[in-house]
Structures are given as structure tokens and as C-alpha cells.
């Protein structure tokens, strides 16, 4: 169990304001830094390999290292912006260089994307307000409970499926709110989008959606005076970049097969991490 480096009681109030210090990473123990570096490699891998999961499959591990969500959410948000843009732009750039065709021809379903945004934008904003205003331990426990539910569904191969317009609406509203609080609403949103989009269009349309929603979240963080940890990107963006390249290779493989065993393994890991995180926060509170 990784011992949580809790902030002193008087400094755990929200939001985390900008200071003249570089960031909390200044006095981070070396082995914590190594763990965070490896977790961000994993984050980049699952984001580009699966089209989602950069947050839901990495944030629980990060919170075991340090249980302050507002330390890591800005980092994960910026990585989502950078690598979702790269993933969408890469085919355009490759086609332009190899064939001289620079048309903005993407696999994004813009019409459906506008429909999804119209539904998710309000709960997204409510979730962002919640993560800024609520105490850290409340958000941390909320994240671990949601991750536990996801882990059980993956382990049992019972992923969220929507087969009715009313259920579509419920999943999108919940997914928008959870995304606003913790960036882990992807499985609920994907349950809806996967039913309406071709598989070739799903990943890029998801990335476009994440880009817009995360931009809103980062703008809210900046407006609230939360430290966006810009200096930490100097060493964590390369980590996510390594994972991103590996994930692109995995994505090409996953289009040909159904990686059920992989997702079941992920589910078991998420259950373990979520239970460990809930136990850790309960011990810290007692």
C-alpha cells in the first residue's frame, strides 16, 4: 500500500490557489515521482489504444500516491487536449505529406458530436463546480466508488450498454456530470455513442468530445485559481507520449480482435485499486 502524503489539515481546503512555488512536485520523493511517471505512461497507452480511459484507468493509481484530485486533474486534462489533438491530426498530416492531400478529412461525426454536446454540457458544468467546491476526501471517495463499479463491470464482462433513448439520456447526463467532477465519465458516454456510430468513427469522435469538454474544465480551473501544474508537464508529457505511441500500435491490433481478456484484467486491477483507495481514505479520516 502506498502511504498517502496528505496535506496538513489547514491546507486541504479548496481550491488549491496558485503560489510562487513551482508546484507540489518540488519536494516529491523520488520513488513517488517514478511511480507517477509510470502511471502517466499507462495513461497515454490506454488513451490512444482504447479511445478512452486516460483518466479512469490512471486516476485511481495516482490517488493512491497522493489523494488530492486537484493535483492530478489539471495534468490529465492537458494531456487529453494534447494527445486527442495529435490523434485526430495525425491522419491528415500523414495524408498531406505522402499524397499531398491536405483536406480536413477526419473520422469525426460532427453532426452527432453536436447532439452529444447539447446534452452533456450542463451536467458537465455542474460537475466542474462540484470538484472545485467540495472537500478533497469527498471527491476522492466518489472517484473510487465509480471506479469500483467500472471494475466490476469489466471483470464480469458486463459493460454498460444502452438500448433505449431514455437510457441514452440517463447515461449521457450521468457521464457528463462524472466527467465534470473527475474525467471518468467515458464508459457511460461510450455506451451510448458506440450504439450510434460506426466503429471507425467512434474513437476520433470521442477524442473531439473529450477535447471540448476538457477545455471547459481547464478554463474553470484557471478561473478558480487552481494550480495547473505547468512545470510538471516538462517530465510527464514525455511519459504520456511514450504510452501514446505504444497505444497507437495496440489500437491497430484491437480493431482486428476483441480484447475481452485484456479488459477483464483491467477490471480486476481497478477493483483492487478502488478498494485499497477507499480503505486508505477511511484510515486517513479516522
How would you name each of these model-derived features?
Residues 1-21:
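N-terminal amphipathic/basic-hydrophobic helices that include classical n-h-c signal peptides
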Residues 32-110, 171-180, 184-245:
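Small-residue-rich hydrophobic segments that form or flank transmembrane alpha-helices
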Residues 143-145, 152-175:
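Alpha-helical multi-pass membrane helix bundles of inner-membrane/thylakoid proteins
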Residues 116, 120-128, 136-156, 235-249, ...:
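Selective transmembrane alpha-helices of multi-pass membrane proteins
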Residues 24-29, 70-71, 133-140, 229-233, ...:
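Interfacial loop-to-helix junctions that mark the boundaries of transmembrane helices
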Residues 107, 157-163, 196-200, 252-260:
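Membrane-interface helix-boundary motifs at transmembrane edges
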Amino acid at each position: 500500500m502506498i502511504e498517502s502524503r496528505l496535506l496538513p489539515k489547514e491546507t486541504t481546503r479548496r481550491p488549491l490557489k496558485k503560489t510562487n512555488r513551482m508546484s507540489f512536485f518540488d519536494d516529491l520523493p523520488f520513488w513517488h515521482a517514478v511511480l507517477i511517471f509510470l502511471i502517466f505512461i499507462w495513461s497515454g497507452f490506454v488513451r490512444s489504444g482504447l479511445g478512452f480511459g486516460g483518466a479512469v484507468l490512471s486516476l485511481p493509481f495516482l490517488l493512491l500516491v497522493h489523494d488530492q484530485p486537484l493535483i492530478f486533474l489539471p495534468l490529465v486534462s492537458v494531456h487529453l487536449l494534447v494527445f486527442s489533438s495529435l490523434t485526430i491530426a495525425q491522419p491528415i498530416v500523414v495524408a498531406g505529406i505522402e499524397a499531398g492531400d491536405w483536406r480536413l478529412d477526419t473520422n469525426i461525426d460532427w453532426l452527432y458530436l453536436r447532439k452529444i454536446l447539447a446534452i452533456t454540457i450542463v451536467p458537465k458544468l455542474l460537475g466542474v463546480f462540484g470538484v472545485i467546491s467540495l472537500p478533497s476526501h469527498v471527491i476522492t471517495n466518489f472517484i473510487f466508488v465509480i471506479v469500483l463499479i467500472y471494475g466490476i463491470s469489466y471483470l464480469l464482462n458486463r459493460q454498460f450498454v444502452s438500448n433505449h433513448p431514455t437510457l441514452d439520456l440517463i447515461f449521457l447526463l450521468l457521464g457528463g456530470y462524472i466527467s465534470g467532477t473527475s474525467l471518468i465519465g467515458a464508459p457511460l458516454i461510450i455506451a451510448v455513442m458506440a450504439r450510434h456510430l460506426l466503429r471507425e468513427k467512434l474513437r476520433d469522435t470521442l477524442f473531439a468530445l473529450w477535447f471540448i469538454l476538457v477545455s471547459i474544465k481547464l478554463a474553470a480551473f484557471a478561473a478558480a485559481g487552481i494550480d495547473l501544474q505547468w512545470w510538471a508537464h516538462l517530465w510527464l508529457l514525455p511519459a504520456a507520449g511514450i504510452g501514446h505511441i505504444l497505444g497507437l500500435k495496440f489500437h491497430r491490433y484491437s480493431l482486428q480482435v476483441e480484447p475481452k481478456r485484456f479488459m477483464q484484467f483491467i477490471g480486476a486491477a481497478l477493483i483492487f485499486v478502488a478498494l485499497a483507495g477507499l480503505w486508505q481514505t477511511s484510515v486517513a479520516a479516522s
